[in-house]
Design a protein with these regions (language model features):
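Positively charged n-region of N-terminal signal peptides that target proteins for export
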Residues: 1-9
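C-terminal motif of bacterial Sec signal peptides marking the signal peptidase cleavage site
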Residues: 18-19
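N-terminal hydrophobic targeting/anchoring segments and the immediately downstream early-domain regions
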Residues: 25-102, 106-116, 283
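Second-shell residues forming the walls of enzyme active-site clefts
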Residues: 40, 78-91, 100, 110-112, ...
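Short acidic, glycine-rich surface-loop motifs adjacent to enzyme active sites
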Residues: 48, 63-79, 160, 168-169, ...
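Active-site mouth loops of central-metabolism enzymes
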Residues: 48-56, 128-140, 222-235
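Short, acidic/polar
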Residues: 53-63, 140-147, 238-239
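A substrate-binding/cap region within the structured catalytic cores of diverse enzymes
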Residues: 126-194, 198
Length: 291
């Protein structure tokens, strides 16, 4: 290839395309087995990759591996108008034989890849925690719908949200991005947010499995350990993920923290034990690794 392609996330993309209502599926269920049967090994591998296109000159090289989806960061939206974003995303779709998943992180608060651009939104979306504190769960649902509609209007069909971590301690690394409430309230938030996103027609991603509450460090910067007991994880951290899955969440994103009670040898993103907790319920994404 002319340029090095940055592979950001591994994702079970074939399963996602078959199961997620957020993508307009132009290949019928009866045609999919035939399509897969005609794919080369290289093409099948490409379909399980969720990648980032660093610049427009890279698009042809990137599409040659037939990726399942493209993840867009803040710098991919920066300074662009709505029409320019739509044109960029459509150019990706036009070069793909299979409809692409186009993903972005628009949680609200500190993670606003799209609404940070004033050309795309009048102001940055507030965090779910702030919205909840101001107007309760009804306001959170309305906000989730507004975010979904904005992303879909641009051609983004997956929002890497909601944050399902249970955090009530302001010193936790994930506190500001969480709802800041207990497990039961967080589970209700996740369930209603996923339902709102499904109703809008956008894919949701629960994160960061099996929970990032009660952890003080950033696993992007170094090794982070979670010392909670397995019982505490089952009774608290897993509740929002279970609620989100039952509500019809599209995916689960796995964190990089090492959860000692479940697998003390591997970070969650590389843990067969933790992956196997999900495989019978839902496909999952590995937390992005920094290039």
């Amino acid at each position: 290839m002319k340029k090095t392609i940055s592979i950001i996330i591994s994702i079970a993309m074939c399963a996602m395309l078959a199961s997620c209502g957020g993508v307009k599926n132009e290949v019928s269920d009866t045609e999919q087995p035939t399509l897969i049967d005609t794919m080369s090994l290289e093409e099948k591998v490409g379909q399980i990759l969720f990648v980032r296109c660093v610049d427009d000159e890279q698009t042809d090289d990137l599409m040659s591996i037939k990726p399942g989806g493209i993840l867009m960061f803040g710098r991919d939206f920066e300074g662009l108008t709505k029409d320019e974003v739509k044109e960029k995303i459509q150019s990706y779709q036009d070069k793909s034989d299979i409809p692409l998943i186009i993903g972005a992180d628009e949680e609200g608060g500190t993670v606003v890849r799209v609404s940070s651009n004033p050309n795309l939104a009048p102001e940055k979306f507030k965090s779910p925690q702030e919205i909840y504190n101001e107007g309760g769960m009804d306001a959170v649902v309305e906000n989730a719908t507004e975010k979904s509609e904005l992303l879909l209007s641009l051609g983004v069909n997956m929002n890497l949200a909601p944050v399902a971590d249970v955090s009530t301690n302001p010193s936790d690394y994930m506190y500001d991005r969480s709802l800041g409430q207990n497990a039961e309230v967080t589970a209700d938030f996740v369930s209603k947010t996923v339902t709102a996103m499904n109703n809008a027609g956008i894919m949701s991603v629960l994160k960061h499995f099996p929970g990032y509450g009660g952890v003080g460090g950033d696993s992007h910067q170094g090794t982070v350990y979670d010392d909670k007991t397995a019982e505490s994880i089952r009774e608290n951290d897993l509740l929002p993920f279970k609620a989100g899955i039952e509500a019809g969440a599209s995916c689960v994103l796995v964190a990089h923290n090492t959860v000692n009670a479940l697998d003390s040898e591997n970070p969650a993103s590389l843990s067969p034990t933790i992956h196997n907790m999900l495989r019978l319920s839902l496909i999952h994404i590995s937390e992005p690794t920094r290039p």
